[in-house]
Structure formats: C-alpha cells, structure tokens
Design a protein with these regions (language model features):
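Conserved ABC ATPase "signature" region
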Residues: 26-35, 92-93, 130, 134-137, ...
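Helix-to-loop junction immediately C-terminal to a conserved catalytic motif
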Residues: 77
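Conserved ABC transporter NBD signature motif
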Residues: 85-93
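Conserved ABC ATPase signature
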Residues: 163-167, 171
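A short, proline-enriched helix->beta-strand linker immediately N-terminal to the Walker B motif
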Residues: 182-186
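ABC ATPase "signature
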Residues: 248-249, 257
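Conserved small/polar residues in nucleotide/adenosyl-binding loops
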Residues: 280-282
Length: 282
C-alpha cells in the first residue's frame, strides 16, 4: 500500500429530489435528514463526506441499510452524479469529466462487483469473464488467455466452458470477481458482494479476495453492513449513518475508540481475538 492518495473525496453531497441544488443552498444544517425530508420533500443521500483512499489499500464503507453507503460509492464512479463536492482520482476531479471520459474511466480504470452476480446466462464462464475485454476490442485469442489467467486466480480451473446455471452461488460470484479482474482495473468497487452467500461460502470468498489483494495490490472499495466483515477486509473503515460518515479509522482504532454510541453498538460484541485475527492478512 502506497502513501499516495488514489482517491480524494471532498465535501460530497447527494440530494435526491426536484431541486437538489436549491435545497442544498438553503439547507438548515441543524436539521436531521428526516426533518429535511419533511420540510423540503428532498432526501439527503450523502451529507458532506470527505476522505482519502491510498493507492493499493482496501477501504471499507460500512453502515446499516439506508445509511448512504451504496449512494456514496456510486458517486465515486459517477454512476450517480453528486449534487456538490469534488471527486478526485489520480489528481483529476472527475466531476468535470464528460460522457466520453467517464466511459473510459469505467472501461479501463475501474470495475464493480455487485451482490447479484449479473452473469450472462447464455454465455459460458470464459465468455462472461472476457466480456469487458471484448467491449474494448481485444482479440479473441488475447482475451481468452487473460480470462484463463484470472479464472485460475479465483480458483475455477476447469470451469471455463460451463454455463452460469451449472455453478453454485459462490462459484458464480468468483466468476463475477474474475470478470472484474480481467480488465486489470486500477480501482475495484465491491457492493456487498458476498451478502447473499451462505456463511461458510462467504468466509471462503473473503479469504480468497484477501489472498488476491495481497498479490495484485489494487485500490479496493468494499461496501458492507457487517462489522466483522469490515474489520476483516479493511485497511481503513468509514462508518456511515444517515448519509454522514461518523468515523474513519483502522479496524483496531474503531474497536478501541468508538466515537459514539452508534459505532459502539457495532464494536461492543466483537471479541478482541476477532480483531487480531482480522489483521493477519493471508
């Protein structure tokens, strides 16, 4: 992990509604999110969020349902346009990017892995994995070679010519991970990728991703609602509530010094040995 920031998020706001900019300009900052919605009919998805993500680190965004974590991460890729703020990647504010620049960013530098695998049922595993390379115009021989390489990396040797329906849920998620890795992105974004899996398979996938990250050292953003998963996966964790980041720190910092009762509720039942184990990366 480098000390150089890969992503810098500065004062990001996302307000949903008919007049988001006007609502932000006239906002009474003393009001809660529920009060803002009641008075204006607008919903604050992300509220004045700032942080840095270093090159090669795994940054976890953690919070309960409705906390704003998925909205925030979609702002990072500009799948959702923020209402205000700066989103700086490699020194460039992508808020100023046009459609062509955003397409290039998502096609060449950034990949996403979702909870629902999104595999093409009519395409074999190898063709699902190589899809991003196909979109880029990479030759069939080259994309098959790269797809086979990442297939091996995620532990699916021998499954190249099978269809998704022939795979278990855990195996399908491995294909989703391989598809994201195949395009060799600088940034990988995971939106609760393992939450639909059985607990045992979920732990296996967490371990697999930690193993891969130790090898490839990508910049990873990982969303979860599970605090144990957060402390296992993250170099740093941002905990969200009602659209705000309430605390950022390493797993051990957050467990040792929760900033308020909301964070303390996540940490109080976590045995110390769990934190220590989470820091032993594969």
């Amino acid at each position: 992990m480098s000390d150089t920031p890969k992503i810098v998020c500065k004062n990001i706001w996302k307000i949903f509604g008919t007049y988001p900019q006007r609502t932000l300009e006239n906002l009474d900052h003393s009001l809660s999110r529920a009060e803002v919605q009641a008075q204006t009919g607008h919903v604050i998805g992300v509220k004045n969020v700032s942080f840095e993500i270093k090159k090669g680190e795994t940054f976890v965004v953690m919070g309960l349902s409705g906390s704003g974590k998925s909205t925030l991460v979609r702002c990072i890729s500009r799948l959702i346009d923020p209402t205000a703020g700066e989103m700086i990647i490699d020194g460039e504010d992508i808020m100023h990017y046009n459609d062509a620049q955003l397409t290039e960013l998502r096609r060449y530098r950034m990949s996403m892995v979702f909870q629902h695998f999104g595999l093409f049922p009519h395409r074999k595993v190898i063709d699902n994995i190589s899809f991003g390379l196909e979109i880029r115009g990479v030759s069939k021989k080259e994309r098959r070679s790269k797809a086979m390489e990442v297939l091996e990396m995620v532990g699916l040797h021998g499954w190249a010519d099978h269809y998704p329906r022939e795979l278990s849920g855990g195996m399908q998620q491995r294909v989703g991970l391989a598809r994201a890795m195949a395009v060799d992105p600088e940034i990988l974004i995971f939106d609760e990728p393992f939450s639909a899996l059985d607990p045992l398979i979920r732990r296996e996938m967490q371990d697999e991703l930690l193993k891969i990250q130790a090898e490839v050292q990508k910049t990873m953003i990982f969303i979860t609602h599970d605090f144990l998963e957060a402390i296992k996966m993250g170099d740093h964790i941002a905990i969200m509530k009602d659209g705000e980041v309430v605390q950022i720190g390493t797993p051990e910092e957050i467990v040792a010094n929760p900033i308020d009762d909301y964070v303390r509720e996540f940490t109080e039942d976590v045995p110390r040995y769990k934190v220590l184990l989470s820091l032993i990366h594969i």
